[in-house]
Amino acid sequence: KKVVNKLKLRASVGRTGNDKTGQERFLYRPTFTTNAGGFTQGIGDTGGTNGIGNGIVEGRFAAPYLAWEIEDKQNYGFDLGLFDNRIDIIFDYFRSERRDILLQRRTVPQLGGLRQDPWQNFGKVRNQGIDMSMNLNQQIGKLKLSARGTFTFTRNKILEYDELPQKYGYQAVTGTRVSENTLYIADRLYTEDDFIVSTNANGLKTYKLRSELPRPTLGGLIGPGDIKYVDVNGDGVIDSYDRVRGVGNPSTPEIIYGFGLNAEYKGFYASIFFQGAGNTSVLLGGATSEGWYPFSWGVDQSNYRTFALDRWTENNPSQDVIIPRLHKNNANN
């Protein structure tokens, strides 16, 4: 029997445009607002101010140069059938580059006199990856068996982004992946050895951070069990300059995979399917969360209760915990 019974090669190159950017249709037209703050023309005859209604000011600046976003795409792949299609393989490599992305400029100085940041076709993102699937089929008498596996990997890179030059290159968005996080890097949890400990008459302890350690400026009272962050720029202070772009993985998974099994016998059919994601990171509580607490949604239906049990305490001063020392309010650390 022939080993290869099907082979199909595919290649495509194209260009597409996108005008559905989630904004209004007439972004290129200027707007004016009539509810601007009122103004006066001096003092009236009775001694009061001589007020004259609200003014008219320009809102959005005209942008007749706006155009569609452009995306250049390439795709190369093959379909392969083996052993009378008992094994069927589909593989694709794709690459695209999206440019002239419609966005509001972030680096226009206020001296320009614009009340709103102007819109412009600016920005470029490259995306590439592979997509593949494999099907296995076998019949034993009246029993039909099949299995299917899928795998997708994609990675993007921001080639052009409207940002001011950063003091430290590790904070720049350009050159990183879309939806990556800018975060502090946790070194470990503080221990009592990191502090000068004092105990008052009531037995309560106060902690003063040792001078040789980087000084946090994030707010709150620091103590054993709190997170000790990395002083990335080495200036002896933990502040916004120690936040690093690209810590962990993007919030959008780069890997999607799945596996399934099917069985059919005399009209009865059974199927199972598994699916997973990889190369992704999740922030507990969200990127802008001010902390979390039990019954945040009215009814505690999350894993937070389980996470909270695996936390640092004086009786469990472990570095291998999910949650650091708990506070009764937002401690900013």
Spans of model-derived segments:
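Short edge-strand/loop segments of extracellular domains
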Residues: 6-8, 152, 168, 279-281, ...
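Membrane-proximal N-terminal amphipathic helix
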Residues: 131, 297, 303-305
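Short, hydrophobic/aromatic alpha-helical segments in well-folded domains
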Residues: 62, 77, 243, 256-258
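Extracellular/periplasmic, surface-exposed regions of secreted and cell-surface proteins
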Residues: 1-185, 332-333
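Short glycine/proline-rich turn/loop motifs
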Residues: 55-58, 237-242, 328-332
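Active/binding-pocket-proximal capping segment
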Residues: 94-99, 108-110, 276-280, 287-291
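Glycine-rich, aromatic-lined ligand/substrate-binding cores of catalytic
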Residues: 250-285
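Conserved small-residue
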Residues: 24-37, 120, 139-249, 291, ...
